[in-house]
Amino acid sequence: MGKIIGIDLGTTNSCVAVMEGGQPTVIANQEGNRTTPSVVAFTKSGERLVGQVAKRQAITNPENTVFSIKRFMGRRYDEVNEEMKMVPYKVVRGENGDARVDIMGKKYSPPEISAMILTKLKEAAESYLGEKVTQAVITVPAYFNDAQRQATKDAGKIAGLDVLRIINEPTAAALAYGLDKKKNETIAVYDFGGGTFDISVLEVGEGVVEVKSTNGDTHLGGDNIDQRVIDWIVSEFKKENGIDLSKDQMALQRLKEAAEKAKMELSTLLETEINLPFITADATGPKHLQMRLSRSRFEQMVEDILQRSMGPCKQAMTDASVTPSQIDEVVLVGGQTRMPRIQTLVRELFQRDPHQGVNPDEVVAIGAAVQGGVLGGEVKDVLLLDVTPLSLGIETMGGVFTKLIERNTTIPTRKSEVFSTASDNQPSVEIKVYQGERAMARDNRLLGVFQLGNIPPAPRGVPQIEVTFDIDANGILNVTAKDRGTNNEQKITITSSSGLSKDEVEKMARDAEANAADDRKLKDTIDARNRADAMVYNVEKTLKEHRAKVGEAEAKEIEAALEETKKTLNENDAEKINAAVDRLTTASHKLAEAMYKSSSQPGAQEAPPTDGQPKPDEKGKDNVVDAEFVDVDDKK
């Protein structure tokens, strides 16, 4: 069996590693660098460039140089408006509604572009190992959804790699950190990358890495910080010279490089100079850009972006039921964590100095290589237990979101529940799969829809539809709906979902608590309405079949209670609906009594109960079992 490589497919940079002699080794690329810029360029002559060489020519070829493609992976065109503003290349709508990159008239999918980066890393590994590489473990942000994970797997396939496992970046970092740890520790992995932010709380030690909780924001990263600096430079230059550099793509590409360089320098310096000669020209001649940026001004400029990482950290600790004092180490991942202000925020929140013993650019790839070693049998006695970041479920009657798998459930996992039809002789059911934390389905993220048809005609509530959610070790979801009566089955692998927007993540996970009271009230009302609807249906059906067994006065009393209950079905008051149902239940008791008396007469037919309960066993003529009772005096 060949070597299994570990790949960190990053927004800004990517890295590849492999296990050798029981230890992970980072593999340098063909240029001798341990990380490779996640940049792909297409020249006018048709040549394709990847990595540092592509990044170097970006200034002169901005429209055909693709970077930060990870931000478009598995996302629909309608959801990448903010990302599109941050890149000079053309992003267009694909035939299926997904985002595509248009390079000189040819449309590329994000997995295709990512595959070009993966191919370069794969070739570097093959050159280093002296053998063909066909298998890999690739990392993704913990908050990546199903479509984004699937897109990453597809990129691997396009690059000729069998992706044995997709693992979360913070989990990979914890694997690398905890490889030699003998004592048990609770750690937090704070992963601030180029395009995404993740936080995970884990327990590591004695070969076990168990994720307790995870949270994050797939629209928060170093790119946002770079963009803020670019906007500041454009604004300052416009004030001084009256020229808007944001309209010049070539100038913007130079500004992007300058902003990134200034950001990096301000991690070690208190002030930096941004110097871009001949940035543009007007009628008076060429213009040069020269300005100074202090660390304090820079930190003020991006403080709100950095603060966005604090909410997920607090939520992750709450979900893991730990306090900052119970966390033994905070491991920083991602080049952005070199920023002093981020380290200060982490120190203030977790009440300890962050761990500096790992390389934030390489630790994720190292962890992926460790997982590759586990899968290949090279690394023994290491157990990885990851979780799903958001709850998963389906829409049920009244638009309620019924969770089948709760967030932070250890994966792989499988959960089944039985549902039924909502109307008589319903020929099919539509299964709508959602991801989120809100009580109502509409407030969550729709992942996919599929139909289960050919349901035999039957009264509502009779067919048994078994819905099964199955999350594999890659975090990819499969949903199956099966009619237990016919064994007819439909299955969907959720691949049509898209990235969660900045506000949607908050709506799903962190704002769920703020909306909990309203959600609960609405859910109670719908539950009451469903109960009333079922009661009305059962009583109407029974009254129609057995009206002759009760007097006219009793029948009219039941009908009046039915009408009153029907009127409350449009109310948004659970108490009012429940009160009407109670009155209907009381009124229908007389019908039940009459049916019971009738059924006890010789030769009488057994009538169905009015409360929707299962009928007694019909195999025998009655269900009475003769038995002798012995009074036992138990003396101890």
Curated annotation (Swiss-Prot):
Phosphothreonine: residues bearing it: T196
Reported induction: By stress conditions e.g. heat shock.
Pfam families noted in UniProt: HSP70 (PF00012)
Single GO MF descriptor: unfolded protein binding
Highest taxon of the lineage: Bacteria
Biased amino acid composition, Basic and acidic residues: 614-624
Keywords, comma-separated and alphabetical: ATP-binding, Chaperone, Nucleotide-binding, Phosphoprotein, Stress response
Disordered as annotated region, ranges: 591-636
Reported function: Acts as a chaperone.
PANTHER family in UniProt: HEAT SHOCK PROTEIN 70KDA
HAMAP family: DnaK
Family the UniProt entry places it in: Belongs to the heat shock protein 70 family.
Protein name: Chaperone protein DnaK
Organism in which the protein naturally occurs: Solibacter usitatus (strain Ellin6076)
Organism lineage string: Bacteria, Pseudomonadati, Acidobacteriota, Terriglobia, Bryobacterales
Gene it is expressed from: dnaK
